Amino acid sequence: MGPGLLCWALLCLLGAGLVDAGVTQSPTHLIKTRGQQVTLRCSPKSGHDTVSWYQQALGQGPQFIFQYYEEEERQRGNFPDRFSGHQFPNYSSELNVNALLLGDSALYLCASSL
């Protein structure tokens, strides 16, 4: 694998362990090169209307990216504008990262709540 490749592993924040959160993320893993764009999707647990996205770099704790509630961004962490999102009427959400950098290589997590 060349130095320009980014490995992206995606897991559910609560759905990956013993707790069944009902959150579904796709794709489950992804490899991209620097400069490309990526879109990650999250379907929340039935009845949940809030979706939060997190980035977890190797050896670090999860860092809050943003939260969507009823199709509007409610809160945003300290991430550049290259990180954007959207929530659809069915409450599913997308995380978009443009102009990928090597430092964007991380675990991306979504969580849903009421």
Swiss-Prot record:
Name of encoding gene: TRBV5-6
One record GO biological process: adaptive immune response
Keyword Acyltransferase recorded: no
Function as written in the Swiss-Prot or TrEMBL entry: V region of the variable domain of T cell receptor (TR) beta chain that participates in the antigen recognition. Alpha-beta T cell receptors are antigen specific receptors which are essential to the immune response and are present on the cell surface of T lymphocytes. Recognize peptide-major histocompatibility (MH) (pMH) complexes that are displayed by antigen presenting cells (APC), a prerequisite for efficient T cell adaptive immunity against pathogens.
Signal sequence, renumbered to the chain: 1-21
S-S bridge residues: 42-110
Name listed for the protein in its UniProt record: T cell receptor beta variable 5-6
Residue positions the entry lists as glycosylated: 90
Ligase in keyword set: no
Source taxon at top rank: Eukaryota
